[in-house]
Structure formats: C-alpha cells, structure tokens
Amino acid sequence: MAQEIRAIVRIGDTDLDGNKTVAYALAKIRGIGIATAYAICRKLGIDPHATLGLLPEDQINKLDWAVRNLHELAPAWFLNRRKDPETGRDLHLIGSELVLAAKRDVDLMKKLKSWKGIRHSLGLKVRGQRTVTTGRFGATAGVTKKKAAPGGK
C-alpha cells in the first residue's frame, strides 16, 4: 500500500507545503531560515531531504515542538532575540510574535525619543545611509525642454 502524502502540514501556526523537503518547508516559517531548518533536523535526527508530507505524525509533532522551543535546543548565539528587554531571557520568536516584537521595539524607540526613534518617526533612513540623493519622496521635478525657434538653423 502506497503511503498517503499530506498536501498541507501545520507546524508553528503556519501551513506548510507537504510536497517540499523538510528543510525547505520549515524555512517558509517566518523566523526560521534554511540554516535553522537544517539545524533543527540535525538535532532531531530527521532527514532534511525527506518529503514533509510523508513524515509520520510523531515526527511532525517533534518538529512543531522544536520550532516553538528552539531556545531550549540551540545555543544563545543562534537565536533571533537574545536578552529580551521584557524578560531578560534568550528567545527565538516565530511568526506573528516576531513581527509584533519588532514593532514594539520600534515603538519603544519612538517613545524614548532616541536617535533611531526620531528617524523612524520622521520616516527617514535609520542606519546611517546617505540621504542627499537617495530616499527622496514627493513629486519628481522634471526638466522641460525649450521649444525650438521656427526657421532656425
């Protein structure tokens, strides 16, 4: 009997394509890149080149647990939110948690009126890029060409 392939697998509150390999399917989760996906597979002993939809339910549950609790499996330097300002713990955020944490960080900078916060609130570049010629907004000032004189050379 041929094994059924699941078209959609839910891991980390994200619907993943069951036809892709495990590593590349995991990389579709926001906050999990390809290197992190391979590290998770290596840590759990799952073949990263296996098709995700063919994995048994217990391995999918292991993957879901590992994605949600990566801070327990990986060293601190591998995580995407070290020394969280609110809790002081090393975390690895995924999905909407990652987006909301970044938004909260920017809002905090704006509230504290730090240099970066002021630049964010003004809609200017934040990381030291040049702004003389690039990053302009508003209508472009076009150059109009003079009308040619009639009968001229």
Curated annotation (Swiss-Prot):
One Pfam family matching this protein: Ribosomal_S13
Keyword Transmembrane helix: no
GO cellular component: cytosol; small ribosomal subunit
GO molecular function: rRNA binding; structural constituent of ribosome
Disulfide bonds: none
Keywords: Ribonucleoprotein, Ribosomal protein, RNA-binding, rRNA-binding
Assembly, per entry: Part of the 30S ribosomal subunit. Forms a loose heterodimer with protein S19. Forms two bridges to the 50S subunit in the 70S ribosome.
Function: Located at the top of the head of the 30S subunit, it contacts several helices of the 16S rRNA. In the 70S ribosome it contacts the 23S rRNA (bridge B1a) and protein L5 of the 50S subunit (bridge B1b), connecting the 2 subunits; these bridges are implicated in subunit movement.
Designated name of the protein: Small ribosomal subunit protein uS13
Species annotation: Pyrobaculum calidifontis (strain DSM 21063 / JCM 11548 / VA1)
Lineage of source species: Archaea, Thermoproteota, Thermoprotei, Thermoproteales, Thermoproteaceae
Recorded name of the encoding gene: rps13
